[in-house]
Amino acid sequence: MSDDAPVRRPILGILSIVLLFILYRVFAVYTVRSGECRPKAVDPSVRILTRDEAGRVVSFPERSGYPQQQRPLVVMTYNIEGHDELYDGEHAAKIAETIREFKPDIVGLQEVHDHTWQVRFRNQYEEIRRLTGMNGYYGRSYRSLGGDFGNAILTRGQVVSAVVHPLPSIGEPRSVLEAVVRVDGATLNVYVAHLTAWASFNSKSRGVQLECLAKHVRTSRYPYLLLGDFNAPPGSAEVAKFAKEDAAQLCGADIKITHPTLGERIDYIFADWGWRVAGARAIATGASDHYPVIAQLFWSRN
């Protein structure tokens, strides 16, 4: 046997693992099917928003449930990097402190753990909800070694109803949490999503997921907001599907980075056609590997 055999074996082992990973990713990207998307039926009394080729709204949906506002609705989306609780037992408390500081009316949370080993078998959603004093709902995306992993919504108002919709994906399951929320006498549909990661490897998968999200939001009875970590920058083909609903673009806010490690903006607040966005920004805080994004909105189609 050659003297360099002990050296070659670990190298071949590493190369085999890398090859298997690449094959898995290729399989995931090119076998995802949009047919797995099952949005609820459209209410026949709701006309669907359409746009011409120039992007102008040519047909307005009938939205109900929103009274005249005395102040802006403050909305936040926040990927909380829930697994960091394993290394920092105060992680959930730091997330809650950030939320309390900015006093949002509605918060969409991603990467929330419920009794997984990564959070020391604690109920992360309940802990954050209790520390913020808000109401809410947790929606599981998948089971993880006896615990759950998913998205959550918090609100200063009330969650009237909520449902989890699976998103088309292969590998780690993804979902969107849909909730009907009532706050300050107003009723709206809020969607919280976390799309497939792994950069350009899964751009096709994210594109299919965003097509599915577009179908879901079009069924909204009330003014809607779509919040989440979309794992793609603004210039990507997949995010372009919602570019005209981007709260930051609607108010001219220059949000460059929401994930400082990647140096990219991948977290968004997308707003229904009738929202006027008074302001939006990313909040540079170190509680998570993502920055929370916050926006102030007025409903303008009363």
Model regions and ranges:
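Residue-level detector of structured alpha->beta connecting loops
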Residues: K103, G133, R156-Q158, R221, ...
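Active-site-proximal beta-strand/loop segments in catalytic clefts of secreted hydrolases
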Residues: Y78-E81, Q110-V112, G139-Y142, T155-G157, ...
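Structured beta-strand-rich core segments of catalytic domains in phosphoester-bond hydrolases
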Residues: S34-P67, Y87-D88, E111-T187, L195, ...
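Active-site beta-strand/loop signature of hydrolases that rely on acidic residues for catalysis
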Residues: L73-I80, I95-F121, A179, N189-A193, ...
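Acidic/histidine-rich helix-loop elements
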Residues: I48-T50, P72-A93, H113-W117, T196-S205
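Extracytoplasmic/periplasmic, Sec-exported soluble proteins
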Residues: Y87-H91, I99, P104, R120, ...
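Extracytoplasmic/secreted proteins, especially bacterial periplasmic and envelope-associated proteins
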Residues: E90, K94-E97, E101, N123, ...
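Metal-dependent phosphoester-hydrolase catalytic domains
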Residues: D4-L15, Y24-S64, V164, K215-L225, ...
